[in-house]
Curated annotation (Swiss-Prot):
This is NADH-quinone oxidoreductase subunit B 1. Pfam families: Oxidored_q6 (PF01058). PROSITE patterns: COMPLEX1_20K. Residues 195-204 have a biased composition (Basic and acidic residues). NDH-1 is composed of 14 different subunits. Subunits NuoB, C, D, E, F, and G constitute the peripheral sector of the complex. InterPro entries: NADH_UbQ_OxRdtase-like_20kDa, NADH_UQ_OxRdtase_20Kd_su.
Length: 221
């Protein structure tokens, strides 16, 4: 028995002869390539996650204004599947720390992060969130990575919406390359989640090798 997939436009012209089939036989392999997708489960899960990152609606300072601008029609963040702003951390898997993090605000941020869905990601946006910025004082946390695992750092004071969107694209690339996007693996001591490497530690050697530094005017462009 031989068969193939066909469309109405594939029907041969003219009357059908006795004993002939009106379905054109193009070969099983050719039709299978058009309608069958072969992949691995972890690649499919990673592809779905990187294109449906749901950020939590949270802001601290002027950097939040730049992040909110990226949702407007001029920048159209919906192109990357991250336009679904959630009002509850229990429905989000991304939090953007945009602004100055004070000592009194750190426990609140930690609690919001703990309530987020897993796997969850953190983007540190702006100089204040990255390293405290110009506020080198007792009341400001000198970098949100002191108490939260940061996946992407977006520099600037404040960074433009384009910079935030580039950081989001870098995060999507990292999510798509995860070898085990299901997070939990079977280890020698039972089911556990492997520890993720810090992006700051991975890129430290490259930053230390830099010999040419740009001027502040070039950085803002």
């Amino acid at each position: 028995m031989r068969w193939s997939l066909s469309k109405p436009s594939d029907k041969p012209s003219g009357p059908a002869t006795p004993g002939s089939s009106i379905i054109r036989d193009n070969g099983f392999e050719e039709d299978g390539r058009r309608s069958v997708l072969l992949t691995r489960l972890q690649d499919l899960v990673a592809w779905g996650r990187k294109n449906s990152v749901w950020p939590y609606n949270f802001g601290l300072s002027c950097c939040y204004v730049e992040m909110a601008t990226s949702f407007t029609s001029k920048y159209d963040l919906a192109r990357f599947g991250s336009e679904v702003i959630r009002a509850s951390p229990r429905q989000a898997d991304l939090i953007v720390i945009s602004g100055t993090v004070f000592i009194k605000m750190a426990p609140v941020l930690q609690r919001l992060y703990d309530q987020m869905l897993e796997p969850r990601w953190v983007i540190s946006m702006g100089s204040c969130a990255n390293s405290g910025g110009m506020y080198d004082i007792y009341s400001v946390v000198q970098g949100v990575d002191r108490f939260l695992p940061v996946d992407v750092y977006v520099p600037g004071c404040p960074p433009r919406p384009d910079a935030f969107m580039q950081g989001l694209n870098l995060l999507q690339d990292a999510i798509g390359k995860e070898k085990r996007p299901l997070s939990w693996v079977i280890g020698p001591q039972g089911i556990e989640r492997p520890a993720e490497e810090s992006q700051r530690d991975l890129k430290r050697s490259g930053r230390m090798c830099a010999t040419t530094l740009r001027s502040p005017d070039e950085v803002q462009k």
